[in-house]
Amino acid sequence: MPAPVPALLCLALALASAQPSPPPPPPFPVVATNYGKLRGVRAALPGDVLGPVTQFLGVPYAAPPTGERRFQPPEPPSSWAGVRDATRFAPVCPQHLDERALLRDCLPAWFAANLDAIAAYVQDQSEDCLYLNLYVPGGANGKKMADDVTGNDHGDDQDSRDPGVGGAAAAAARKPVMVYIHGGSYMEGTANIVDGSVLASYGDVIVVTVNYRLGVLGFLSTGDQAAKGNYGLLDQIQALRWVEENAGAFGGDPDRVTVFGSGAGASCVSLLTLSHYSEGLFQKAIIQSGTALSSWAVNYQPARYARALGERVGCATPDPGSPPGSPPGWDSASLVSCLRGKAAGELARARVTPATYHVAFGPTVDGDVIPDDPQILMEQGEFLNYDIMLGVNQGEGARFVDGLGGGHDGGYGGYGGGYGGGVEDDEVQDGGPDGAAGGVSAGEFDLAVSGFINDLYGRPEGRGDALRETVKFMYTDWADRDSPEARRKTLVALFTDHQWVAPAVATADLHARYGSPTYFYAFYHRCHGGGGGGGGVDGVAGGVAGGVGGEEARPAWADAAHGDEVPYVFGVHMAGPGDVFGCNFSRNDVMLSAVVMTYWTNFAKTGDPNQPVAQDTRFVHTRPNRFEEVAWAKYDPRGQLYLHIGLRPRVRDHYRAAKVAFWLELVPHLHGLAADPGAYLSAAATRAAPSGDPDRDPGGGGGGRRRPRPATRRPAVMTSSSMASGSGMTSSSGSGMTSSSGSSASAVLIETRRDYSTELSVTIAVGASLLFLNVLAFAALYYKKDKRRHETHRRPPPPRPPQAPPSAAAADRNPRPDPGPAGRRGGECGAVVTAMAAEASAGGLGHDGVGGVGVGGVIGGVAGLRLACPPDYALTLRRSPDDVPRAGAGPGTMTLIPGALGGGGGGAVHGFNTFGSGVGVAGVAGVATSQAGPGLPHGHSTTRV
């Protein structure tokens, strides 16, 4: 008898439960790399949406750059025996968070606003700092179910690349790798600040954050072989080599590597796409708020700042070959040797302040890592092999305006006290709409614009004033020109457009010109919540500690400032309380962060931010978000489509097109560079710092020039006279590389450019003369046409045939009443007119086709005859323009109606018609013509005669 079905089910369940379940993954997994084994730590993330992540922290990717390796390219790391602990962060690269030395305008808003919190991450500094951090997703609790390919940590610690461990399944499950380059104006910052766990778990990607050499140690250059510079960029390239070699050990795909960064990190990413050293190391790039075309992206005067550094730290070594009594030269090799002997902290603390909108120590055009000017490389298509996604934030330039206006001392950033830490205005604290009392005054506006133009374009005679006035005109809100708040808003737009938007659009145009996949975004959201912790959102931590100062004091005018997209990219809103990003995030913030992470990781997977994972944030809201209905279109130079990222997303086109065209097209022409587009600029170019003391305070005067498109282009070129001045730095090998020295010879000579003021004056004079002659000719033509019209359309009809006088009988049958004296005078006038008409007809004046007497023609035909009676005003009223018959006498006859002048009717009889709507043509062969055009003399003219 068969067993009952319930009994069989119970037996099966018992057998299944008797089998041993797989052991839970260990809390400290071990992975074998090419250089040795690493022990990481498995971290659980809050909420039901995020799965666990394995972190490998402080992993060396290069040998320590100490001793003789200082100011040298990085070398691969040495192997180690045993298992290396990778559960703690490694020391950060030397830097100095001095408020006076920070380039705050180019720092992320959250960085500058929370220096006290940032300082905690950079306390442990060492020149041995070339380490990276890995965040590897794993576990079945993640939103995107991910296989734990790091499960090679049992028993013998086998390598996951071994076919015996996972085999083809492990190879098929390899995850994309996203390598993050942190920002900080090349002088400060660390990858340890940003936690990649949430991004890795939510997007199912491996996230790598990289520390690289900063400031003097990372970017010192003498302009010759003694110190070529770009060591920080070479560190990043070495990190990418390490990822290529070892990504498989962590389950990553070395053929799907995406490099992304924000601010100075974005500029580094942009430069990496142009360097042949990084070919094959990554396939996609995400450039957030910064490109290689910005004025602060590349340093074109490295030797000048190297010399200034030597003077600061006591390494000003005279050239032994210089004759006695001559200005001391500079031996670059001796300078570098001296700097190698200095402590790293001393070099980091040395204050060498760059010119405004420039950097003292940053990437340089060395002919090797960066072989040429970035714009030239882009125009040559050096970066077309990469898929690129790039964009800007709405209010990138807010920090440039920070501190302007009454009631401020440091603005929303406070220059060291959190958002609003320095704000004293009651309206801001009370949540007023303006954010600061008084906004920006007219004087402050003029000074800000003048300083901006002077620092970037110099003070060329004549053209500088015209350029300043043009910029003021373009960035004046003429609908509210007297409003201080409007001035502040337009100033933010000015700095944003010039420093971020125009370079980004120029980069996108150059990349998409030949069809390379390009996506552009504009980020329009910032946190509006108050400081302090908060509750969770459906299993996702929704509160982040208020940090320093708190977001509640951040004024409304700040918009989405520089760096505000970073916490949304890394999912800080889901990670729980923190101390760097000071805001209590709302449900909308959590939703938008999920959206941004989906876009970023989709792009890393496929090169298309729309796939393979669809937008879905129902874990935050019960209803779908608006991004589910938006398809992010590719960018192309013609359509210029971009995604507006905010709570109301939409795909739009031509982001700030008018202002971008102003900076990329008009400003270079206004500055007089269009006549010589191939000429290299002087050392005072916009990409190069203005001449003068490199340690002057930012905002001081300086000269500068730029070439067209995108307005910050070319490196310095020195004239023979400046090379022979003997006041610059020369290498020991006699390379002849020259830098300025002293006030008398501090500036590299500017190439002589032709003055076009005389030609312009002559052109204007000739044009005015031709215009006057045209006006005279037109007036004469009009007079002749008017006279001809009167002569043609006032001609009398032919005389009527003679009629027999009425008989006396008929007269008796129809007696006429006596008209009286007036009537008799009218009759007399009629007789006179009849006689005049007959005489005119005999003179050949003809018929006017209207059927009435042409008074003008009569008077013209018998000009010598004067009427002996008063005029008949009834006739005048009948022959008013409104009563002129409109039908022609026959085919082909055209009647010109004087009443149509200035009214309706046909088109103008001349291209520069002075009438309101042209001379009206009633009709030709019975067909009415179209209405006249507008009243201006020409469609593109404002001249009235």
UniProtKB/Swiss-Prot annotation:
Disulfide bonds join C93-C129, C315-C338, C527-C583. InterPro entries: AB_hydrolase_fold, CarbesteraseB, Carboxylesterase_B_CS, Neuroligin/BSAL. GO terms for molecular function: neurexin family protein binding. It is found in: Cell membrane; Postsynaptic cell membrane. Keywords: Cell membrane, Disulfide bond, Membrane, Postsynaptic cell membrane, Signal, Synapse, Transmembrane, Transmembrane helix. Residues 145-167, 685-742, 787-828 are annotated as: Disordered. One of its GO terms (biological process) is social behavior. It comes from the Eukaryota. Residues 713-742 have a biased composition (Low complexity). Residues 19-761 are extracellular. PANTHER family: NEUROLIGIN. Belongs to the type-B carboxylesterase/lipase family. This is Neuroligin 4-like. It comes from Mus musculus. The lineage of its organism: Eukaryota, Metazoa, Chordata, Craniata, Vertebrata.
